[in-house]
Amino acid sequence: KVKLVCFPHCSNVVGQENSVARIATMAHDVGAVTCCDGVSYAPHGLPDVGALGTDIYLFSSYKTYGPHQGIMVVRRALADRLVNQAHFFNADVRYKRLTPAGPDHAQIAACAGMADYIDAIYAHHHGGEAAPADRARAVAALQRGHEDRVLAPLLDYLGSRNDARILGSKELGTETGRVPTVALHTAKPAEEIAISLAEHGVICLLYTSPSPRDRSSS
């Protein structure tokens, strides 16, 4: 029997969002717990974790303009079922009981800067009073719109070429569930493309398997 279903909120390869609520419902229907990895989606959507329905949602806050700190949301009913992993005197403290070494107080305090950053953007573009969740949604919409405007020319250009094929959706907009992560299948080797882009001032990080020559010399 399936006990735990783990899945990403969004593909980190083709940039396609998964239906978290639908997956969570399907898993819950058979009595399974769900764990959603949001690291590839969080910077593009600032998700409403409560509305998604998953039991666990986690991501790294450096993806959302914060420190290099892991953030995990666990529904209370599930958190109370999990075995304490911390000191015995923290067994009843939910935000401590799953952290064996104890909270990293400096990193946690630094996470407040993420809210300050979102509030600063909201004040600049909108101003006025609004609830924190409403401010976050408004800023997320601004950021997503900007991402789409930047990505559109690239997708149009790639779509016009016969030596490159976009993997995943070519359509933009929140309704398509597509975030600005682009994967390609190209006629040329990735190394040649990276070198060519570098000559035009485009930063490229190239990750490849060792070549036969490299393997033979090791």
Protein language model regions, located:
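Active-site phosphate-binding strand-loop segment of PLP-dependent enzymes
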Residues: 1-43
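Structural detector of well-ordered beta-strand residues that form the stable sheet scaffold
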Residues: 35-37, 58, 167, 205
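Active-site PLP attachment segment
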Residues: 51-94, 102-110
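Conserved small/polar residues in nucleotide/adenosyl-binding loops
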Residues: 207-214
